[in-house]
C-alpha cells in the first residue's frame, strides 16, 4: 500500500500544530528504522524534493494493534509526521496508511539561491534518470528493535584506510549507513588525493554512477542541520573537491545551512571554512557566506590563538575586504610575530599577496627569517615568495640577492627548468642576478640539447630584457647556440612567437640570418599586422629601426608598411625641473630644445648643441651657420627607476637599445634619473648636470671634484 509524502498544506489543520522543522530529521531517522521503505525522489523544476514512500511489513509493535479499536482513526505522532489508520484495522502486511510529512526550511525553494537549473547530483545519465533517485532500505521485522543490528559508527579515517576506491566507500555506506554522512564524503576525498589524475577522473565517473551515491547525497542534506558544524564544513569541502558542481541542490543546500549556523564557528571551523571558501567559485550563496565570514572574523580576530589558522583566515579574507579589517588582521599578525615559525614566515608573503595588503613591517621581518633559514628552502616556497613580492610590488634587494646566491651556490642540484623559472620571476621583478645568469648561460652552451621551443622563448626574453649579454665574455657562444636552437623550430613556430624571438635578438644587438629572413616575408608581416595587436606593430617598428641603424647589411632591407605608433609622453613634473636647471646652467632656453621627436619614433626630453669636444654650448640660432661636422648633439633623457635593473645603474634592454640607436644617429646620451633629480636642491642639480654635460677637460677643478663624489 502506498504512502505519499505531500506538502504540509494538503493535510488536516491538526497536523499544522507543530512548526519545529528541526525535529523532523530526528524523527525521520527513528521512523526509518521501524518502517521498511522504498523511496522514489522526484525533483521538480524549482528544485523541490517530493518523495513517494512505500511502506510494507508494518510492525511497529507486535501487540500494538491489540490496544486499538478497529473503527477508530489512529494517529501516530512523530511531531511533524502523522499516520492515519483506515477503518480496516492495523495489519502486519498491506496496511493502508497516509503519512503527511512537512519539509519547511531545508528544501524550501524560496529560501535557496540558485544560479542555474539545479539537480541533486550530477550523474552521467539521461534527463529522466537525473530527476529520479531510488533509495532502498531492507530492515528485518525481527531486528529493527535490537541493538545488535544497529551499525557501529565508523570514522572517515578508518573508512579511508579500509577502502581503496571511492566506490568502496559507497559500498560500505549502502551496506550499513551510519551517522554522520560527512564521514563518507571526507573518506572519499582522502582516497581521491592519493590517486593520480587519470585514476581520479575514472573513480569520479564511477562515483557519480554508483547506485548509493544519490542516497548518500540525500542523507547528507537531511543531516546537515543536526550534525556538528565542523563535520558540515568537512563534508562541504570534500564535496567541492570531489568535483560535484556548485549549482546542484546538494551544494547549495549545504551552503545555505552553513550560513544559518555560522555563529557555531570556533577556531577550527574558521580554518576549515576559510579553506572551503577559497576552493569555491563565486555565486550568490558563496558571496553571502563570505560576507558573514568577514563579519565573524572581525568579531573573533583577537581570539584566534593558532598562527596557522590566522594565516589561513587572512588568505581567505579576499582582496576586496574592508581596509579596516585588513589592518586589524595585520595588527594581530604583528602581535604574534614572536611566535612565527620559519614556515609561518615563508607563508606570510603569499598570505599578504592573497589579501592585497602591503605590510612593510611584516614583509621585512619575514624576509630576515627567510634569509636566516635559506638553506634547504624548497623551490615551491621560493617561487611563492618571488611571485608575492611582484604582486605586492615589494622590492627587497637583500632578499633577492640571498635567494639568487643560494640557487647559484647549489646550482648543480637544480634541474634546468627550475632554474629557468626562478630567472623568469627575477626578470618580472627587474632584478638581475649576475652570478646565476652567468652559470645558466654556461649550462646552455655546454648542453644545448636541453632547449625546447618554450624555454628558448623564455630564455631570450629574460636575457634581452635584463640586458645581460652586454659585454659578457661568452656572449657570442650563447647567442649562436640560441639562434641555432631557434632555427631548428622555424618550421613549426608561430608568427607571433617568431616575432617575440626576433625582437629579443634585436634588443641583444644580434641578428641571425634564418629567423630574420623568415619573419621578413610579406605574408608573415601581413598576418602579424592584421591581428590588430599594437604590440606586434611596436615590435615590427623596432625591427625596422634595427635594420636601418644597426650593422645588418647582410639582411634584406625591406620597406615595411607599418601603422603609425602613438608618441611617447614626457614626464612633465621632472622635465619642468630639468628645464629650469638647464636654463640656469646654459644661460636661457635658447640654448636647448625640449620634447624633441626623432625619426624611427624615438623621443628625447632635451637636445643640446655643442662643439665636438663638448667644451661649449652653441645657441640654437647659430647652429644653421655651422657645419654639421663641427657639432656634437647631446640628448638628455629623463628616465625612471624601472628603466634600470633593480638596485643598479645597469640599463634594461629597451633603454640600452635606445642609447645604441641614438649613438648611431650622432647623439651623445646623458641619463638623468628622475628620482635623484627630485631630491636635489637647485644648486646641487645645476652642479650635477654640469658634470654630465661638459667634458672633463672643460670643467673647472671644483666641478671635477663634484663629479668624482657622485
UniProtKB/Swiss-Prot annotation:
Q: Name one GO molecular function term.
A: RNA binding
Q: Where is the RAP domain?
A: 634-691
UniProt keyword terms in alphabetical order? Disease variant, Mitochondrion, Mitochondrion nucleoid, Phosphoprotein, Primary mitochondrial disease, Ribosome biogenesis, RNA-binding, rRNA-binding, Transit peptide
Biological processes annotated in GO: apoptotic process; mitochondrial large ribosomal subunit assembly; mitochondrial RNA processing; mitochondrial translation; positive regulation of mitochondrial translation; regulation of mitochondrial mRNA stability; RNA processing
- Pfam families hit by this protein: FAST_1, FAST_2, RAP
Where would you find this protein in the cell?
Mitochondrion matrix, Mitochondrion nucleoid; Mitochondrion matrix
Query: Which SMART domains does this one have?
Result: RAP
The secretion signal range is none
Q: Which PROSITE patterns match?
A: RAP
Function (record text):
Plays an important role in assembly of the mitochondrial large ribosomal subunit. As a component of a functional protein-RNA module, consisting of RCC1L, NGRN, RPUSD3, RPUSD4, TRUB2, FASTKD2 and 16S mitochondrial ribosomal RNA (16S mt-rRNA), controls 16S mt-rRNA abundance and is required for intra-mitochondrial translation. May play a role in mitochondrial apoptosis.
Noted disease association is: Combined oxidative phosphorylation deficiency 44: An autosomal recessive mitochondrial disorder characterized by onset in infancy or early childhood of global developmental delay, hypotonia, and abnormal movements. Combined oxidative phosphorylation deficiency is present in skeletal muscle. Most patients have seizures associated with status epilepticus. Additional variable features include optic atrophy, hypertrophic cardiomyopathy, stroke-like episodes, and increased lactate levels in serum and cerebrospinal fluid.
Q: What name does the UniProt record give this protein?
A: FAST kinase domain-containing protein 2, mitochondrial
Query: Organism, per UniProt?
Result: Homo sapiens
Which gene carries the instructions for this protein? Answer: FASTKD2
